[in-house]
From Swiss-Prot:
It comes from Mannheimia succiniciproducens (strain KCTC 0769BP / MBEL55E). Belongs to the LpxH family. Its cofactor is Mn(2+). InterPro entries: Calcineurin-like_PHP_ApaH, LpxH-like, Metallo-depent_PP-like, UDP-diacylglucosamine_Hdrlase. Coiled coil: none annotated. GO terms for biological process: lipid A biosynthetic process. It is found in: Cell inner membrane. It is a peripheral membrane protein. One of its GO terms (molecular function) is UDP-2,3-diacylglucosamine hydrolase activity. This is UDP-2,3-diacylglucosamine hydrolase. Hydrolyzes the pyrophosphate bond of UDP-2,3-diacylglucosamine to yield 2,3-diacylglucosamine 1-phosphate (lipid X) and UMP by catalyzing the attack of water at the alpha-P atom. Involved in the biosynthesis of lipid A, a phosphorylated glycolipid that anchors the lipopolysaccharide to the outer membrane of the cell. Its main location: membrane. Binds 2 Mn(2+) ions per subunit in a binuclear metal center. Pfam families: Metallophos (PF00149).
């Protein structure tokens, strides 16, 4: 049976080895069954440049390369934590980078895929920050800094983000329903898949739209969406 897998928001880091093991289990035992695998952002908890080397990065690189060498394409849309992941890393393992919004045909259904952070328009402070850090000249300047300095800056931003989340309401950090409907109309699709909010669900939106939200990963649970010609559902998946 033809099938495609979607994952996002793993937030892999050196201090979460069980998460890395869970990702490796997925890539070794589940992903090879697919026609394609889509990673919709925040694969890593942070990314400061393709020049960083670590055991974690090498392990993830190896898993993606093993999959793509089996002629199973692996696609990636940048998240808010790993938007600096670049062509150098992608080329090293066969990962295919996609734009922020991409329409893919899933067994006859045109589907818009994205990370999901752009849909959270009520979070004005975040959207302002996002526009700034996505400016190419800022990114080029940042990548010119020494690696140790970039890591310190990323860690500071990450800690500030955690603090800000505690101060924001759940509604602000979720998607804006009106904007979502505008996106459906703009791209002329009836189905959307995204991550970012960590609120795994399949929403039916009248009159005929479907919005599928990928969940985040935990040490003992992986949010994996399987799409086939017959059905769309989340796999039950626990740590190995």
């Amino acid at each position: 049976m033809k099938k495609t897998y979607f994952i996002s928001d793993l937030h892999l880091s050196e201090n979460r080895p069980k998460l890395t093991a869970l990702f490796e289990h997925f890539m070794h035992n589940i992903a090879p069954q697919a026609q394609a695998v889509y990673i919709l952002g925040d694969l890593f908890d942070f990314w400061v440049g393709d020049d960083e080397k670590s055991p974690l990065i090498s392990r993830v690189q190896a898993q993606i390369k093993q999959l793509t060498e089996k002629n199973i394409p692996c696609y990636f849309i940048h998240g808010n934590r790993d938007f600096l992941l670049g062509e150098k890393f992608a080329e090293s393992c066969g990962l295919q980078l996609l734009p922020d919004y991409k329409i893919v045909n899933l067994y006859g259904t045109d589907t818009l895929i994205c990370h999901g952070d752009t849909l959270c328009t009520d979070d004005v402070n975040y959207q302002t920050f996002r526009r700034k850090v996505h400016q190419k000249w800022r990114q080029r300047l940042f990548l010119l800094l020494p690696l140790k300095v970039r890591i310190k800056i990323a860690d500071k931003i990450r800690r500030q983000s955690r603090h800000d989340k505690k101060m924001k309401s759940a509604e602000i950090m979720d998607v804006n329903g009106e904007f979502v409907c505008q996106i459906f109309e703009r791209f002329n699709v009836r189905q959307m898949i995204h991550g970012h909010t960590h609120r795994q669900n399949i929403h039916q939106i009248p009159p005929h739209f479907k919005r599928i939200v990928l969940g985040d990963w935990h040490d003992d649970y992986a949010s994996i969406l399987e799409v086939s010609e017959q059905e769309t559902y989340f796999l039950p998946q626990t740590a190995r």
